[in-house]
């Protein structure tokens, strides 16, 4: 015979999987065309020269070269460009 009252149920125990967002290639790093530079939600970084923007706002290299981060415009937007070699 059990001498322990039944435990109540919990409403915890769920958490979403991490999405591995962030900068994948940093300033000055050499990249090949097609390399992912940044995975992001929304446009924290904008695509500059030789950089493409995917459906999920992923920035990727369109040409081989070096990654360059720059702040431009009246709103101080962050742009990522590739300086072709």
UniProtKB/Swiss-Prot annotation:
CC per GO annotation: cytosolic large ribosomal subunit
Residue ranges, annotated region (Disordered): 1-20
Domain of life: Bacteria
GO BP field: translation
Gene3D superfamilies to which the protein is assigned, alphabetical: 2.40.50.100
GO molecular-function term, one example from the UniProt record: structural constituent of ribosome
UniProt keyword annotations, A-Z: Ribonucleoprotein, Ribosomal protein
Family as reported in the entry's similarity comment: Belongs to the bacterial ribosomal protein bL27 family.
Entry protein name: Large ribosomal subunit protein bL27
Originating species: Proteus mirabilis (strain HI4320)
